[in-house]
Amino acid sequence: MIGRLSGVLVYRGRDHIVLDVRGVGYVVQCSERTLAGMPAPGGPVALFTELLVREDLLQLYGFPTLLEKEWHRLLTSVQGVGAKASMSILSTLGVDGVGRAIALGDWGALRKAQGVGPKIAQRVVNELKDKGPEVMAMGGTLEAALDGVIEDGMAASEGIEPPSAARPAVPSAASDQAGALSALVNLGYGQGEAASAVATAAGEGAVGETDIIRAALRLLAPKG
């Protein structure tokens, strides 16, 4: 299994890149958001990867963060959602949007992804409503675990020091939401209701872990 690749960008296509790793060129499928963040050819790239193995195909999919990779694995666990549909969802919504849609039961947001119909969108929400919050809560943990690992690995494998933009990292918004979710769960709220409140708070403009917690607590407070 190939879990991560770091090397030099050779080519960027419409839905994939060619990554040179010590003289070997790997074709890696990526979401539109990931492709948009790629450097110019010749620049350093590090991606976490998932290998799809079929009788007639070996296909690598690349992700700038472990959080996005985990969402891809979770999405493709749903019947009817293949790698292509998962990449379309991630391209359209990003990791924050996917987590928010599932936490809020907003299958209409998932329908915006090309190739995702209403039945599939509803199935994703229904099957992942309990598992999604667990992935949302991983954001901060993954960020801490990655600190310094990518730079050291790329420097050792390629003899170059990658710029900070090339380092896969969990987006700060995802980390803030993960921290807020963890805090609410520690206060005794159920993971599902906490995730819904965090997603709503973030969607209404709360920024930063503290503000998200405060806004979520207001949403969770008994009415009347």
Swiss-Prot record:
Q: Where is this region: Flexible linker?
A: 144-171
Question: Region labeled Domain I — which residues?
Answer: 1-64
Q: SUPFAM superfamilies in the record, alphabetically?
A: DNA helicase RuvA subunit, C-terminal domain, Nucleic acid-binding proteins, RuvA domain 2-like
Give the start-end ranges of region Domain III.
172-224
- Main location group: cytoplasm
Which Gene3D superfamilies does the entry mention? 5' to 3' exonuclease, C-terminal subdomain (1.10.150.20), DNA helicase RuvA subunit, C-terminal domain (1.10.8.10), Nucleic acid-binding proteins (2.40.50.140)
Q: Mind listing the UniProt keywords for this protein, alphabetically?
A: Cytoplasm, DNA damage, DNA recombination, DNA repair, DNA-binding
A GO molecular-function annotation: ATP binding
**Keyword set includes Membrane:** no
User: Pfam families under this entry?
Assistant: HHH_5, RuvA_C, RuvA_N
A Gene Ontology biological process noted in the UniProt record is: DNA recombination
Region annotation (Domain II) maps to 65-143
Q: A cellular component term (GO) from this record? A: Holliday junction resolvase complex
Subcellular location per the Swiss-Prot or TrEMBL entry: Cytoplasm
Subunit (UniProt):
Homotetramer. Forms an RuvA(8)-RuvB(12)-Holliday junction (HJ) complex. HJ DNA is sandwiched between 2 RuvA tetramers; dsDNA enters through RuvA and exits via RuvB. An RuvB hexamer assembles on each DNA strand where it exits the tetramer. Each RuvB hexamer is contacted by two RuvA subunits (via domain III) on 2 adjacent RuvB subunits; this complex drives branch migration. In the full resolvosome a probable DNA-RuvA(4)-RuvB(12)-RuvC(2) complex forms which resolves the HJ.
| Family in the record | Belongs to the RuvA family.
What UniProt notes about the protein's domains is: Has three domains with a flexible linker between the domains II and III and assumes an 'L' shape. Domain III is highly mobile and contacts RuvB.
Q: What is its biological role?
A: The RuvA-RuvB-RuvC complex processes Holliday junction (HJ) DNA during genetic recombination and DNA repair, while the RuvA-RuvB complex plays an important role in the rescue of blocked DNA replication forks via replication fork reversal (RFR). RuvA specifically binds to HJ cruciform DNA, conferring on it an open structure. The RuvB hexamer acts as an ATP-dependent pump, pulling dsDNA into and through the RuvAB complex. HJ branch migration allows RuvC to scan DNA until it finds its consensus sequence, where it cleaves and resolves the cruciform DNA.
Q: Tell me what this protein is called.
A: Holliday junction branch migration complex subunit RuvA
The organism encoding this protein is Dinoroseobacter shibae (strain DSM 16493 / NCIMB 14021 / DFL 12)
